[in-house]
């Protein structure tokens, strides 16, 4: 009769879109009059972005450029976890921005508990950094997605692996 339907809740981002956003930000920084001579560098590592520039004022402008480019590439700003601003050599400042990927166990438990309390016919199971939601009714699953989108979570949630 009715088979079980499911989907996964993940927190992830497109790596290539992030690379493109940083490339566009670097180009704009080199072309903008107020940022042209600041020798600003944006370096991308697999786990973080490092920004090195002249002053905190310039750093704020670079943040603005980076965020604008990320939004245009359909990246959530919740993937950026800004670290502390530290002074570097030559009167420069540096900041590391950690890239948030995956749902930690505590947040997965909150999501799972919210689903279990609000929907009796829906099951949520934690599988590492993924929360699998399953039910016999597709309508219930769609309602769960709508309710999760309404909440303000500390990470960007995506829904994948529809079955």
Swiss-Prot record:
NCBIfam families, alphabetized: PRK05412.1 (NF003819)
A single MF term (Gene Ontology): nucleotide binding
Gene3D superfamilies named among the record's database cross-references: 3.30.70.860, YajQ-like, domain 2
One Pfam family cited in the UniProt record for this chain: DUF520
Protein name: Nucleotide-binding protein AM1_1863
Free-text function comment from the UniProt entry: Nucleotide-binding protein.
Keywords recorded for this protein, A-Z: Nucleotide-binding
Organism: Acaryochloris marina (strain MBIC 11017)
Coiled-coil boundaries: none
A cellular-component GO term for this protein: cytosol
Family, as annotated: Belongs to the YajQ family.
């Amino acid at each position: 009769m009715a088979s079980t339907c499911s989907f996964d809740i993940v927190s992830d981002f497109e790596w290539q879109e992030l690379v493109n956003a940083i490339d566009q930000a670097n180009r704009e920084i080199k072309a903008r009059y107020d940022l042209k001579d600041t020798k600003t560098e944006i370096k991308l590592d697999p786990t973080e972005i490092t920004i090195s520039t002249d002053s905190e004022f310039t750093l704020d402008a670079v943040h603005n450029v980076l965020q604008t480019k990320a939004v245009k590439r359909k990246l959530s700003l919740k993937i950026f976890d800004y670290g502390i601003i530290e002074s570097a050599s030559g009167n420069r400042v540096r900041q590391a921005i950690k890239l948030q990927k995956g749902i930690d166990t505590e947040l997965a438990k909150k999501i799972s508990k919210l689903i279990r309390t609000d929907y009796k016919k829906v099951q949520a199971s934690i599988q590492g950094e993924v929360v699998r939601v399953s039910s016999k009714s597709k309508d219930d699953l769609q309602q769960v997605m709508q309710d999760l989108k309404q909440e303000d979570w500390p990470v960007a949630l995506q829904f994948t692996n529809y079955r």
